[in-house]
Each structure stands twice: as C-alpha cells, then as structure tokens.
C-alpha cells in the first residue's frame, strides 16, 4: 500500500513532473488543491525557507506527510532576479502569469549580450513526516544554461521556452517531458531526495 503524501503546490506543471517521479518512490501523491488547501504567503528569504513554509502548512491542514518544492530562475546579470519571485516576476497571477513573466525577462535582458545571459534553475524540495517534523529532508538541485533572445519550444512551463541548456543544445521547452525529467533542476533535487530517503530508511 502506497503512502499518501500531500504535494504543496497548485502549479499543474509541478504536480505532473513531481508526481511522475514520486510515484516511483512508493508514494501516492495528492496535490493540495485536491484537498482545497491554499498556499501560505511565501515570506522566506531563501528557497529552502519557502519550501519549508509550504510543506509545514500543507501537512498542518491535511494531517498527512507533505512535500514542497520552491524553485526559481537565477540570472546573475540581473543580480539574481527573478529568484524567489520567479513565479510572480511580472506581478500578475492566473493563466497569463507565465507568459507575462517571460515577456518581462526578455524585456529586461534585451540589451544584455549573449556572453552575459547565463542563468540557472534552482530547486529546493522539502519533505516532512508531520507539521512539526524536527528533521525534514532537504534536497537541492541546480542546472545551468542561458537565456535566449526569443521563446523556442512548445513543451514545459514557466521559463522553459527561454532557458537554453548547452547539455542538450536546446531549450527545456523543446524537450519531451521524459527527457526534461532526466536533466532538470527538479529531477536532480528529486534524485538527491531519493538517495536521502534510502539512507534514512523512509
């Protein structure tokens, strides 16, 4: 029998990407939206703090173990922006948020030369057995690339169509989901999580 765990996100892209992998770990993933749990205000100053906030809240509201991911795009030429504010970079919510965020990123980078458009995706995953778990499992992953001058690809979500990965010589949005799962920041963090779970005997 699989262990139920609440995934603390309402982002459908993350739900699919993480559910595919977590199912292999023996977990039955329930998105917090299925339980009518809303996300708390993200007041942390780091990806780890925000992931902890979300996981603790989801566990508190559901009474189940919880897992949360906080991730973002870091562009050194912009002083680390969008960073913690990647999901709300353009200041809008709703179905148009991703497109508006990408448009803003292209706009603020329009004068930046190709040699200075480096970027990295960061993912921090936190897993709790219960709301007050004193020793949460924390797993982090990063992947490096650069921001293109135009969107390419139809797959993925968020900034995927702008993030060019030298490792695969295309944007994340040009990859099939199965290919992205092998190299993405979230995939790397989930791999670290899997190792830590095995070590902990969870």
UniProtKB/Swiss-Prot annotation:
Signal peptide: none annotated. Its EC number is 3.6.1.66. The active site is at 70 (proton acceptor). InterPro entries: dITP/XTP_pyrophosphatase, ITPase-like_fam, RdgB/HAM1. Pfam families: Ham1p_like. It catalyses: XTP + H2O = XMP + diphosphate + H(+); dITP + H2O = dIMP + diphosphate + H(+); ITP + H2O = IMP + diphosphate + H(+). The keyword Metal-binding applies. GO terms for biological process: nucleotide metabolic process; purine nucleoside triphosphate catabolic process. It is an enzyme of class 3 (hydrolase). Substrate binds at residues 9-14, 71, 157-160, 180, 185-186. One of its GO terms (cellular component) is cytosol. Keywords: Hydrolase, Magnesium, Metal-binding, Nucleotide metabolism, Nucleotide-binding. The keyword Hydrolase applies. One of its GO terms (molecular function) is dITP diphosphatase activity. Its cofactor is Mg(2+). It comes from the Bacteria. Mg(2+) binds at residues 41, 70. Binds 1 Mg(2+) ion per subunit. NCBIfam families: RdgB/HAM1 family non-canonical purine NTP pyrophosphatase (TIGR00042). Belongs to the HAM1 NTPase family. Homodimer. Pyrophosphatase that catalyzes the hydrolysis of nucleoside triphosphates to their monophosphate derivatives, with a high preference for the non-canonical purine nucleotides XTP (xanthosine triphosphate), dITP (deoxyinosine triphosphate) and ITP. Seems to function as a house-cleaning enzyme that removes non-canonical purine nucleotides from the nucleotide pool, thus preventing their incorporation into DNA/RNA and avoiding chromosomal lesions. This is dITP/XTP pyrophosphatase. The lineage of its organism: Bacteria, Pseudomonadati, Pseudomonadota, Gammaproteobacteria, Pasteurellales.
């Amino acid at each position: 029998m699989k262990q139920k765990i609440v995934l603390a996100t309402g982002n459908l892209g993350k739900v699919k990407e993480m559910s595919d992998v977590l199912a292999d770990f023996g977990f039955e993933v329930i998105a917090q939206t299925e339980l009518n749990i809303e996300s708390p205000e993200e007041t942390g100053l780091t990806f780890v703090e925000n992931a902890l906030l979300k996981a603790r809240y989801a566990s508190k509201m559901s009474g189940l173990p919880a897992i949360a991911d906080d991730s973002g795009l870091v562009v050194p030429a912009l002083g680390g922006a969008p960073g913690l504010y990647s999901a709300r970079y353009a200041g809008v919510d709703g179905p148009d948020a991703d497109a508006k965020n990408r448009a803003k990123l292209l706009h603020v980078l329009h004068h930046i030369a190709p040699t200075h458009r480096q970027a990295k995706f960061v993912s921090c995953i936190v897993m709790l057995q219960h709301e007050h778990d004193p020793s949460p499992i924390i797993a982090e992953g990063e992947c490096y690339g650069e921001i293109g001058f135009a969107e390419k690809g139809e797959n993925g979500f968020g900034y995927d169509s702008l993030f060019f990965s030298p490792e695969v010589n295309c944007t994340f949005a040009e990859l099939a989901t199965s290919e992205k799962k092998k190299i993405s920041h979230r995939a790397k963090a989930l791999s670290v999580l899997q190792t830590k779970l095995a070590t902990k005997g969870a």
